[in-house]
């Protein structure tokens, strides 16, 4: 991170800090927000604190459309909540690494500390001598600042090394879908097929439109097996080629 882009501002209260945070945010709305586990930790915490201390109307200012909505998702049998901020996309860099960082192989942990060391040879700053972040803040404020800066620097260096955020955007633009839909496959295929049909002057049925409740699809054709050896038989596993296919 360019030192000229680092600014330290001291506040007398959390209320002042959050007000200034909102002012900086709305002065130049981001199109994409990213970070490690940012969706279910940072966004959830920041928006919830703004609502609690400043009110929901102030929290709505985070959205260029002045609309936020809480959503919950079950992850590994545990319900996790976050906030959806209309008008911008939250691309969690941890999810991007899990989805597209396959060249680095399966990881024993997906904590930023481990991934940073696995990919870059760099870890988060250690503050174990202080017990917790509150003690670190009170006893060594400079290390506290450096600790937070290091997290941001690791994300930036991971992107320089892997270009995962760039890949997410490339898949989204190529598939004609939102950035979040680049993590799936159905939306990309639907968009690709839809645009091909339109180019061939064929109007496909609209999801939820007339005829949407015609019942379940019959499904694909499955040929009865013919036992024995057969020449010129080849099987292609296309699943492993996503999103390159």
Model-identified regions with their sequence ranges:
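Active-site-proximal helix-loop-helix substrate-binding element of RNase H-like nuclease domains
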Residues: 3-8, 12, 43, 52, ...
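Short active-site loop/helix that positions an aromatic residue
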Residues: 42-52, 239-245
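Phosphodiester-processing cores and adjacent nucleic acid-binding clamps
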Residues: 32-33, 59, 92-94, 228-229, ...
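Short secondary-structure boundary/capping segments
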Residues: 47-57, 172-176
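Proline-aspartate-enriched helix->loop->beta-strand connector
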Residues: 21-45
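Common nucleic-acid-contacting/processivity interface regions adjacent to the catalytic cores
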Residues: 131-245
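Well-ordered alpha-helical segments embedded in enzymatic catalytic cores
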Residues: 13-21
């Amino acid at each position: 991170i360019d030192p000229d882009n680092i600014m330290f501002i001291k506040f007398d209260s959390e209320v002042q800090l959050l007000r200034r945070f909102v002012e900086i945010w709305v002065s130049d709305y981001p199109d994409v927000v990213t970070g490690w586990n940012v969706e279910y930790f940072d966004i959830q915490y920041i928006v919830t604190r703004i609502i609690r201390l400043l009110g929901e109307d102030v929290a709505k200012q985070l959205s260029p459309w002045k609309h936020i909505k809480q959503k919950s998702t079950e992850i590994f049998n545990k319900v996790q909540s976050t906030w959806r901020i209309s008008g911008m996309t939250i691309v969690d860099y941890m999810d991007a690494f899990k989805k597209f960082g396959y060249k680095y192989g399966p990881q024993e942990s997906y904590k930023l500390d481990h991934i940073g060391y696995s990919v870059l040879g760099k870890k988060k700053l250690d503050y174990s001598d202080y017990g917790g972040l509150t003690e670190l803040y009170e006893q060594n404020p400079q290390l506290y600042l450096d600790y937070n800066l290091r997290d941001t620097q690791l994300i930036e260096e991971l992107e320089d090394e892997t270009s995962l955020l760039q890949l997410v955007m490339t898949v989204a633009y190529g598939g004609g879908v939102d950035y979040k839909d680049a993590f799936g496959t159905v939306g990309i295929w639907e968009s690709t097929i839809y645009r091909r049909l339109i180019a061939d002057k064929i109007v496909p049925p609209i999801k939820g439109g007339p005829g949407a409740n015609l019942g379940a699809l019959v499904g694909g054709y499955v040929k009865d097996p013919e036992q024995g050896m057969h020449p010129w038989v080849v099987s292609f596993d296309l699943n492993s080629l996503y999103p390159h296919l």
